[in-house]
């Protein structure tokens, strides 16, 4: 739309969702950027104090970039997610500037802006995105007009977890750089590692690190190695599940050199491309709001003043991505009929009657952590597959087991992710209901780990499984599955209803578990 965004036009972007107030101008490239971060004298960020900082610094920050007001074609602002007081301060300023300059207002999702500035800065087109910041930790991918969330933190964001640990040891805010510096002098210590499918949980890890009596450098090393390995694992799982070939790291925690190194190694092993934007575009910044506002404006996405309320819980998957017209791809790699297949955690040799699943070492993980996970998961998988089968749950027959390898029956059928339909998803619901009825949670319920055969859905890949009759564990199990369906299908509600029908038909405790799953879903918000 050349009349809306002429060649010499600029978009003014205002970012202020949390601690950093930032303004930028974007045309064909970044023209100007100025920021004023709020640094608390002690402890963490207090929302009211951050908003007061933004209000007092707004005039100076905007005036530093707004040198040619006649060229402004729109004012973009971070509409959410974020801290309510900070969002309100920025939104008020954006509305005033929109009126004063007589230009449209564009409301930008903060999370999507991180992704879009990353795509612009790296040239990546359709990546799996690891978005790691203070309050947000998500794995995203694009499909048919929206960014879909493959997995996310179930409690606190990675950056906030690092800050919480840093405060407990009187380290400066933000805590990530200080932890990274101390970790260079440390040695590995074992800490809790919590991955649930493509979701993660950091609170137990952070609490254990805070309570550790080990030298601070060692705790920082163990904390980084554990938290980042969790992030890379779920990113690899999304990459393997979706069949994409690019990984993009965005968000403030993405500035950490060790996290970048681990992702780069993982991508090299998988033959995928990896990229991270320059540091300017990683933390919260006005450039990402201005750029995303620009491409939204070019596609006619503007916001009437009377609809410009802030959205503190605004999720990336709520945004209609009108500026991307391609459908996006998932499952571009077809099903394996034989030979060797590579999943996120293992190499699988598919024979005529047997499957040999061998867990391979991950070069991105610290060796001691890698050995521990391989041993624990191999033992647990074989034991729980056999236990579930004895209880009547459709699973493969276990033939043999070693320290890192399981030989099992080959299930000849269709992998569920290639044949998703209400009738097949109902079978999945029945299988999971029976599994939960035996006191086992799968831990990685995705459509990659289910095979439809002879009117049954066979459950495979029990590497993250555990024995539990807790409603919480079962609810998280279902949340992982529903998140997978929502991120990779267009008829999610219909499929979810079919799953619930099958699950409820065989499991008496289904109602309580489904209610808990909804609670878990609501936790996946800006924290």
UniProtKB/Swiss-Prot annotation:
Binding residues annotated for Fe cation, in chain numbering: 110, 114, 131, 284
Cofactor binding description: Binds 1 Fe(2+) ion per subunit.
TM regions (residue ranges): none
Region (Kae1): 1-323
Binding site for ATP: 340-348, 357
Keywords, comma-separated and alphabetical: Acyltransferase, ATP-binding, Cytoplasm, Iron, Kinase, Metal-binding, Multifunctional enzyme, Nucleotide-binding, Serine/threonine-protein kinase, Transferase, tRNA processing
Residues binding L-threonylcarbamoyladenylate, per UniProt: 131-135, 163, 176, 180, 256
EC number in record: 2.3.1.234, 2.7.11.1
EC class (word): transferase
Domain of life of the source: Archaea
UniProt-annotated catalytic positions: 444 (proton acceptor)
The protein's required cofactors: Fe(2+)
Reaction catalyzed: L-seryl-[protein] + ATP = O-phospho-L-seryl-[protein] + ADP + H(+); L-threonyl-[protein] + ATP = O-phospho-L-threonyl-[protein] + ADP + H(+); L-threonylcarbamoyladenylate + adenosine(37) in tRNA = N(6)-L-threonylcarbamoyladenosine(37) in tRNA + AMP + H(+)
Gene Ontology biological process terms, A to Z: tRNA threonylcarbamoyladenosine modification
Annotated GO CC locations: cytoplasm; EKC/KEOPS complex
Pfam families from the UniProt entry: RIO1, TsaD
Domain spans labelled Protein kinase: 333-527
Localisation: Cytoplasm
PROSITE patterns in the cross-refs: GLYCOPROTEASE, PROTEIN_KINASE_TYR
Annotated GO MF terms: ATP binding; iron ion binding; metalloendopeptidase activity; N(6)-L-threonylcarbamoyladenine synthase activity; protein serine kinase activity; protein serine/threonine kinase activity; protein serine/threonine/tyrosine kinase activity; zinc ion binding
Job of this protein: Required for the formation of a threonylcarbamoyl group on adenosine at position 37 (t(6)A37) in tRNAs that read codons beginning with adenine. Is a component of the KEOPS complex that is probably involved in the transfer of the threonylcarbamoyl moiety of threonylcarbamoyl-AMP (TC-AMP) to the N6 group of A37. The Kae1 domain likely plays a direct catalytic role in this reaction. The Bud32 domain probably displays kinase activity that regulates Kae1 function.
Assembly with partners or alone: Component of the KEOPS complex that consists of Kae1, Bud32, Cgi121 and Pcc1; the whole complex dimerizes.
Protein name, UniProt field: Probable bifunctional tRNA threonylcarbamoyladenosine biosynthesis protein
């Amino acid at each position: 739309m050349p009349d809306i965004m002429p060649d010499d036009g600029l978009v003014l972007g205002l970012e202020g969702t949390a601690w950093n107030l930032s303004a930028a101008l974007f045309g064909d490239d970044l023209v100007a950027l100025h920021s004023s971060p709020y640094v608390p004298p002690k402890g963490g960020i207090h929302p009211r104090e951050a908003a007061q900082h933004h209000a007092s610094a707004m005039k100076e920050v905007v005036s530093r970039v707004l040198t040619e007001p006649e060229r402004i074609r729109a004012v973009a602002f971070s509409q959410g997610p974020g801290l309510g007081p900070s969002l309100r301060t920025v939104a008020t300023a954006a509305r005033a500037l929109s009126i004063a300059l007589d230009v449209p207002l564009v409301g930008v999702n903060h999370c999507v802006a991180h992704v879009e500035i990353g795509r612009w800065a790296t040239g990546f087109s359709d990546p799996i995105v690891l978005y790691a910041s203070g309050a947000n930790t998500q794995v995203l991918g694009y499909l048919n007009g929206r960014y879909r969330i493959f997995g996310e933190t179930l409690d606190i964001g990675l950056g906030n977890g690092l800050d919480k640990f840093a405060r407990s040891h009187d380290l400066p805010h933000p805590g990530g750089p200080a932890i990274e510096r101390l970790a260079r002098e440390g040695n590995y210590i074992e800490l809790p590692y919590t991955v649930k499918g493509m979701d993660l949980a950091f609170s137990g890890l952070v609490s254990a690190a805070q309570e550790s009596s080990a030298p601070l450098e060692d705790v920082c090393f163990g904390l980084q190695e554990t938290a980042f390995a969790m992030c890379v694992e779920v990113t690899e799982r999304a990459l393997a599940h979706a069949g994409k070939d690019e990984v993009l790291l965005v968000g403030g925690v993405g500035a950490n050199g060790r996290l970048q190194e681990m992702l780069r190694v993982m991508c090299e092993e998988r033959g995928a491309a990896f990229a991270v934007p320059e540091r300017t575009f990683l933390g919260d910044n006005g450039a990402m709001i201005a750029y995303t506002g620009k491409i939204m404006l070019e596609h006619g996405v503007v916001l009437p003043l009377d609809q410009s309320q802030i959205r503190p819980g605004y999720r990336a998957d709520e945004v209609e991505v009108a500026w991307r017209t391609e459908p996006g791809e998932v499952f571009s790699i077809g099903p394996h009929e034989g030979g060797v297949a590579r999943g996120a955690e293992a190499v699988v040799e598919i024979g005529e009657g047997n499957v040999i699943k061998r867990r391979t070492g991950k070069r991105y993980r610290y060796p001691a952590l890698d050995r521990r996970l391989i041993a624990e998961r191999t033992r647990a998988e074989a034991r729980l597959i056999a236990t579930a089968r004895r209880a009547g749950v459709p699973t493969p027959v276990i033939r043999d087991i070693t320290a890192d390898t399981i030989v099992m029956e080959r299930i000849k059928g269709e992998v569920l992710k290639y044949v998703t339909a209400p009738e097949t998803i109902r079978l999945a619901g029945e299988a999971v209901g029976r599994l939960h009825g035996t006191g086992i949670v799968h831990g990685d319920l995705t459509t990659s780990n289910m095979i439809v055969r002879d009117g049954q859905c066979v459950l495979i890949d029990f590497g993250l499984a555990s024995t539990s009759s807790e409603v919480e564990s079962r609810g998280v199990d279902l949340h992982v599955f529903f998140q997978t369906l929502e991120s990779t299908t267009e008829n999610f509600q219909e499929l979810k209803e079919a799953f619930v029908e099958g699950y409820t038909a065989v499991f008496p405790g289904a109602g309580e578990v489904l209610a808990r799953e909804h609670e878990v879903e609501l936790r996946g918000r800006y924290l």
